[in-house]
From Swiss-Prot:
Keywords: Activator, ATP-binding, Carbohydrate metabolism, DNA-binding, Nucleotide-binding, Transcription, Transcription regulation. Positively regulates the transcription of the maltose regulon whose gene products are responsible for uptake and catabolism of malto-oligosaccharides. Specifically binds to the promoter region of its target genes, recognizing a short DNA motif called the MalT box. It comes from Klebsiella pneumoniae (strain 342). ATP binds at residues 39-46. Pfam families: GerE, TPR_MalT. The gene is malT. This is HTH-type transcriptional regulator MalT. One of its GO terms (biological process) is positive regulation of carbohydrate metabolic process.
Length: 901
């Protein structure tokens, strides 16, 4: 829950001086990105901006306190303030912040600005007391906010010091409106107005001006002069003499003498006790001070002018002026030291009664009351964990004695999940083992199940499949249905283990069960995870269309539950990119990979390795080796500076080995082969992938025999486990091995099976990536005219993509090639005496590449009848009658020019 008073603009008090000259300056605030009000305490920053904000509807107000240095809390209040200003216009951002489903503050703000793009009216956000922020992450995020906020938005920041917001750049670009302490200081005229409102006896203008000069226009000092004069029935001049030259750091003695010592004991006690509350209402005051009718007491304090600020229009919430509140808290620690723990306990109980556990924890920590802290955590910690209030949780758990944790295993489980969420896997098992060893009472079966479910998750994260399987099954036996979260975890781990072991059908069923459980209990990140796993399984089985449909369901869940900024969203974008790449939709594949990198932009660069590998893969499919090399340089740097799951390594190695194949870099392949450990098994898609990388490197080096052994074993595994996509890839690599070894019949057999299997997988680019060797074989198959219709169509599509991206054969018949050909001593006399036109050479190249007449017309952007004329002319010049004769003639010319065909 959010405290309403932190989102309420201060109510304009009676007897305040309207700062007309400053309000005139602020009237053009909408022309600036940032309005910055800076001064020491007590210069009237908040009062000025509350006057300016009066009557403005599209304005949100966020009053900070020390607790707002927690990123999650800061984000919650800031988005709530924006929602307040816009009438709940930014629903997606609000949902993301409520569920803590954002990668960073900057990415949350990026989503916010997308939603604000269609907000047309001027919009204002006021952040008061920004000097309380000392978290550099928040400073960075607010710099991002200022750089990217909409043009019609103005941020208003009130601070005692110059905030770390990169304001120099705004100042240079005239996008900053500044008001400092010199401008905030009262003028003679304003001081006269002030005293006329506050003093019972009028004061002469000269005296008022002199008093104003004595305290340099400091509003707090003027207020103290008036307060002291009223309390002591003394002259304002007497008070002013004491305050002359004083500043905030020397106020304590004055406030004791002139304020605290001049109120009755009951009011003094009330002031000191209530100052421990960062904000207060009737119920809090009654519980903390013991006074009946807390609302009346607050209003009386306000009437006396004792620096109390009303924080909302209803008058329910109040807070002390920061300067006075800080002074009172310091005095409370001195004067009520013995009572202090009890006061904090009372505050914690009252906050709990009103449903604010985070504020209650603040007071329980201050009271040093471990029992109270434990009780709050037992009742509310899991809710806070699910809302990602991780910093406060960690601080709270650290404050509890180990003995308290041992007596409450659920708190140990919570601490372990905190470690898990921070990827401190080794510490999780250490903590749980120590707890089990030192507990004086044995845990019940359900708690054992909770522990084992978490251990299973840690084991699978660590790649220990057997231990993960054992622990997940034990956990499912131990856990009652009521422990739904741990059951979801254990079921998910069980499904993932089955996936890793190649038991795809069983894994798919378990992941579907996980999805149903997670959806039923609104555990959205596990719901998303289970759908992604289903898509991966369907992809591995060769059902790419079904995998696509699972991904569509996952994208819908991401949109509905605002999961765009979870790292898992990158996983979804990545597998969509892989699927699009397989189907030769390269632009879309690359766009998804870039989106995935954007999702992870606030994380360690190593997290982007997989998407970066896909960027390389897209460049390789296009034949753009320069771009591929550029991406590879970064990829190899990341590989050398991190530890990765075997799946990540195999995907990175795949594009490296293909690049070496395309560039003929046998040295790099040999070095890699020497250093790369061989996987123990080949029973899932990532182990198959790494073995395939090894075989490809061996083929490049001419080591056909070991490569063939690898591929035959891979195929045996793939067939038995129904890893049909891997079988499709393996057959293509086996085809290349046979082709290079001169075993043309076996090469054709492997290729025919791969083409047939591609009717199921839809693969295009896995053929294209093999380049000219693949193109030659497909041309021959097309010319034989024996392929079934689907395979024939796919072969023609693959050939077209090879020609488009790799510029094989078509490029050989350009002007430079033709000139060299005509000057060759062995060129046929018929070509020398009846030379083809440049267009006819192009048509011959496309005929050789396997293009139909319609495809040639499309490639050259001319009418089909024109192509027929070109073909008739070139047949006549070459002395051939049939298409196959023209292909053979082109092949002879290419061989003569030294091209391997």
């Amino acid at each position: 829950m959010l405290i309403p008073s932190k989102l309420s603009r201060p109510v304009r008090l009676e007897h305040t001086v309207v700062r007309e000259r400053l309000l005139a300056k602020l009237s053009g605030a909408n022309n600036y990105r940032l309005v910055l009000i800076t001064s020491p305490a007590g210069y009237g920053k908040t009062t000025l901006i509350s006057q300016w904000a009066a009557g403005k509807n599209d304005l949100g107000w966020f009053s900070l306190d020390e607790g707002d240095n927690q990123q999650e809390r800061f984000a919650s209040y800031l988005i709530a303030a924006i929602q307040q200003a816009t009438g709940n216009h930014c629903a997606a951002s609000e949902a993301m912040v409520q569920k803590r489903q954002y990668a960073s503050l900057s990415s949350l703000f990026a989503q916010l600005f997308i939603e604000l793009a269609d907000w047309q009216r001027p919009l204002y956000l006021v952040i008061d007391d920004y000097h309380l922020i000392n978290n550099p992450v928040i400073h960075d995020a607010m710099r991002f906010f200022l750089r990217h906020q909409p043009e019609n938005m103005t941020l208003v920041v009130l601070s005692r010091n110059l905030p770390q917001l990169g304001i120099a750049n705004l100042r240079v670009r005239d996008q900053l409106l500044e008001i400092g302490s010199q401008q905030l200081a009262f003028t003679h005229q304003e001081a006269k107005q002030f005293f006329d409102c506050r003093l019972t006896s009028p004061i002469e203008a000269d005296d008022s001006s002199r008093l104003c000069d004595d305290v340099a226009g400091w509003a707090t000092a003027l207020q103290l002069i008036a307060l002291s004069a009223r309390q002591n029935n003394s002259s304002a001049q007497h008070s002013a003499r004491r305050l002359a030259g004083i500043n905030a750091s020397h106020l304590s003695d004055y406030l004791v003498d002139e304020v605290l010592d001049n109120v009755d004991a009951r009011t003094r006690n009330f002031l000191l006790k209530s100052s421990l509350l960062r904000s207060m209402n009737d119920a809090l005051i009654v519980r903390v001070t013991g006074e009946e009718n807390g609302q009346m007491q607050l209003e009386e304090i306000e009437r006396q002018g004792l620096f109390l600020q009303r924080m909302d229009d209803s008058g329910e919430w109040f807070r002390y002026h920061p300067l006075f509140g800080s002074f009172l808290r310091q005095r409370c620690q001195w004067e009520l030291a013995v009572e202090l723990p009890e006061i904090h306990r009372a505050a914690a109980e009252s906050w709990m009664a009103q449903g604010f556990p985070s504020e209650a924890i603040h007071h329980a920590l201050a009271a040093g009351d471990a029992k109270m802290l434990r009780d709050i955590l037992l009742n509310h910690a899991w809710g806070m964990f699910n809302h990602s209030e991780l910093g406060l949780l960690e601080q709270s758990l650290s404050a509890l004695p180990w003995s308290n944790l041992l007596e409450n295993p659920r708190l140990i489980l919570l601490q372990a999940w905190l470690m898990q969420s921070q990827h401190r896997y080794s510490e999780v098992n250490t903590l749980l083992a120590r707890a089990e060893q030192e507990m004086s009472v044995e845990m019940d079966t359900a708690m054992h199940g909770d522990f084992n479910a978490l251990r299973a998750q840690v084991a699978i994260n660590d790649g220990d499949q057997d231990e993960a399987e054992r622990l997940s099954m034990v956990a499912l036996e131990e856990l009652p249905l009521a422990n739904y979260y741990s059951r979801i975890v254990a079921t998910s781990v069980h499904g993932e283990v089955l996936h890793c072991k190649g038991k795809l059908t069983k894994s798919l069923a378990v992941m579907q069960q996980t999805e149903q459980m997670a959806r039923r209990h609104d555990v959205w990140h596990y719901a998303l995870w289970s759908i992604i796993q289903q898509s991966e399984i369907l992809f591995a089985q060769g059902f790419l269309q079904a995998a696509w449909e699972s991904q569509e369901k996952a994208f819908q869940l991401v949109r509905e539950q605002h999961l765009e900024q979870l790292p898992m969203h990158e996983f979804l974008l990545r597998i969509r990119s892989q699927l699009l790449w397989a189907w030769a939709r390269l632009d879309e594949a690359e766009a998804c990979a870039r989106q995935g990198m954007d999702v992870l932009s606030t994380y360690q660069p190593q997290q982007q390795l997989q998407c970066l590998a896909l960027m390389v893969q897209c460049s390789l499919a296009r034949g753009d080796l320069d771009n591929a090399r550029s991406h590879l340089n970064r990829l190899e740097n990341l590989l050398g500076n991190g530890h990765y799951h075997s799946d990540w390594v195999s995907n990175a190695d795949k594009v490296r080995v293909i690049y070496w194949q395309m560039t003929g870099d046998k040295t790099a392949a040999a070095n890699w082969l020497r250093q790369t450990p061989k996987p123990e098994f080949a029973n899932n898609h990532f182990l198959q992938s790494q073995w395939r990388n090894i075989a490809r490197a061996q083929i490049l080096l001419g080591d056909f025999e070991p490569a063939e052994m690898v591929l035959e074993e891979l195929n045996e595994n793939a067939r038995s486990l129904r890893l049909m996509s891997d079988l499709n890839r393996n057959l293509l690599l086996l085809n290349q091995l046979y082709w290079q070894a001169g075993r043309k019949s076996e090469a054709q057999k492997a290729l025919l099976e791969a083409l047939t299997l591609a009717n199921r997988t839809g693969f295009i680019n896995h053929f294209v990536i093999e380049g000219e060797a693949m193109a030659q074989q497909l041309r021959q198959l097309i010319q034989l005219n024996t392929l079934p219709e689907l395979e024939q169509h796919r072969a023609q599509r693959i050939l077209r993509d090879i020609n488009q991206h790799h510029r094989h054969k078509f490029a050989h018949f350009d002007e430079g090639f033709v000139e060299r050909l005509l000057n060759h001593p062995e060129v046929p006399e018929l070509i020398r005496t009846s030379p083809l036109t440049q267009r006819e050479w192009q048509v011959l190249g496309l005929i050789y590449s396997g293009y139909s007449n319609e495809q040639i017309a499309g490639e050259l952007d001319v009418a089909a009848t024109t192509i027929k004329t070109h073909i008739r002319n070139l047949y006549q010049k070459l002395g051939v009658a049939h298409r196959q004769d023209a292909v053979q003639h082109a092949q002879q010319l290419l061989k003569m020019m030294g091209y391997g065909v």
